[in-house]
A protein has these predicted regions:
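Processing junctions and N-termini across compartments
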Residues: 9, 18, 23, 28-30, ...
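Aromatic-lined glycan-binding groove of carbohydrate-active enzymes
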Residues: 197-266
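Short acidic, glycine/proline-rich loop/turn micro-motifs
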Residues: 122-126, 235-237
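C-terminal regions of proteins
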Residues: 311-357
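Active-site beta->alpha N-cap acidic-glycine motif
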Residues: 17-112, 117-122, 130-136, 141-146, ...
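Short low-complexity, flexible loop/linker segments enriched in glycine and/or proline
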Residues: 126-129, 195-202, 323-325
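Cleavable N-terminal signal peptides of Sec/SRP-targeted secreted and luminal proteins
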Residues: 2-16
Length: 378
């Protein structure tokens, strides 16, 4: 009881330390470290001069089944400037194959965090305190770096499970853990024109669809808004596989046009980043949707002013906005690959549920299955 009381007092004290965010002052909130929440294009560029970024993301565990889809639809793609096309994986820990995560990283894709446990109920994420979020995400960063041999500084992003916002604590955890951006926060009010990425130094105009949303001034982390699509009935949907009124799932042409219509709202508007956010299973069970996505990516890869990129590359451009005429002449992103010595581990007893797990890792095996409070399984 005394421990619970002390933890409660810590949480209250922690919350009290964060100052309430004030209305954004554009004369003080300056790039590259600060940006007001706004639909204004960074750098004051005209829409025609803005590179249209396309962010393709996949959520959840990486395994021997879904890697086949990723290899099929993503590998070997290049943008029109000759640079490899990017994508971002928000990876949850349970049942993830870290040898395959290493493969994705070495292919140039971005690996970000989707929590250690991805557990239900959804209220767990709304109510999680700072300490829980450190175990779910900061510790997952250590786990990912260790078992997939990804440099710690290359793991930059977060997507909260179920897109359930958490108020201030998740962003404070990010600020303290060297994490750069969150890509969990949907908007249905700032779609056309779209809301550009911004920081939380000042109060946000972002609509709060899945409360609680942050209210404090938290310098450091960026928000990449999840700009909603419109389904065929005009209803908003944050992820492609959450749209309710969709074309028939076996109609490739209709799905291609559905994707293209949502893309063109950005492309012919203020060119805020366009997100194709999805879970792999939806493509696996709907081959026509997968074919439509491939067709759409082919289209984007042939546009001279649109680019499939990793999420962090969007932040880098917003911090230093340059016209597309200059962007296409920039050198391609460089990174150091990390050779993986694949090791199969198991059975590993899990201390949280008593089950046995197998793991595929890029170094020595853990003693037990990694979990909350023991991310390296020691």
């Amino acid at each position: 009881m005394r421990l619970i009381l002390l933890l409660s007092l810590f949480v209250v004290a922690f919350a009290a330390e964060l100052p309430l965010a004030e209305e954004c002052d554009e004369t003080k909130c300056l790039l590259p470290r600060c940006r007001c929440s706004s639909t204004n294009i960074p750098g004051g560029l005209a829409p025609r001069d803005v590179p249209q970024f396309v962010s393709v993301t996949f959520d959840d565990a990486v395994n021997v089944i879904n890697i086949e889809t990723y290899r099929e639809v993503l590998y070997g793609r290049s943008n029109s400037n000759g640079c490899p096309a990017g994508a971002t994986f928000y990876v949850s820990h349970e049942y993830t194959n870290y040898v395959l995560v290493n493969e994705l990283y070495n292919r140039g894709y971005e690996v970000s965090l989707h929590s250690m446990t991805h557990q239900t109920p959804q209220t767990y994420w709304a109510e999680a305190d700072y300490d829980v979020l450190v175990k779910e995400f900061a510790d997952q960063k250590s786990l990912m770096s260790h078992f997939a041999l990804i440099p710690d500084q290359e793991i930059r992003g977060v997507r909260l499970p179920f897109l359930q916002m958490n108020g201030n604590a998740s962003f404070q955890m990010m600020a303290d853990s060297g994490l750069v951006y969150d890509n969990s926060w949907p908007t249905v009010s700032h779609v056309n024109p779209g809301l550009w990425p911004y920081t939380l130094d000042y109060a946000s105009i972002h609509d709060c669809i899945v409360p609680p949303c942050p209210s404090a001034s938290i310098p450091g982390p960026w928000v990449i808004p999840m700009i909603s699509w419109s389904d065929l009935n005009g209803s908003p949907c944050s992820m492609a596989d959450s749209c309710y009124f969709t074309p028939p799932l076996d109609d490739e042409n209709a799905w291609y046009n559905f994707i293209l219509t949502n893309f063109e709202r950005h492309y012919h508007g203020n060119r805020a980043p366009f997100g194709f956010y999805i879970h792999e299973w939806y493509l696996a069970v709907n081959p026509a949707v997968k074919a439509a996505l491939v067709r759409f990516m082919n289209y984007v890869n042939n546009l001279n002013d649109a680019f499939m990129v990793n999420a962090n590359q969007i932040i880098e451009w917003v911090q230093n906005p340059i016209p597309v005429s200059e962007y296409i002449r920039r050198p391609c992103r460089r990174f150091s690959s990390t050779p993986c010595r694949a090791t199969s581990c198991g059975p590993l007893r899990s201390e949280h549920n008593g089950l046995d797990y197998w793991m595929q890792v890029c170094n020595t095996c853990p003693r037990v299955y990694p979990w909350l409070g023991n991310p390296l399984g020691r």
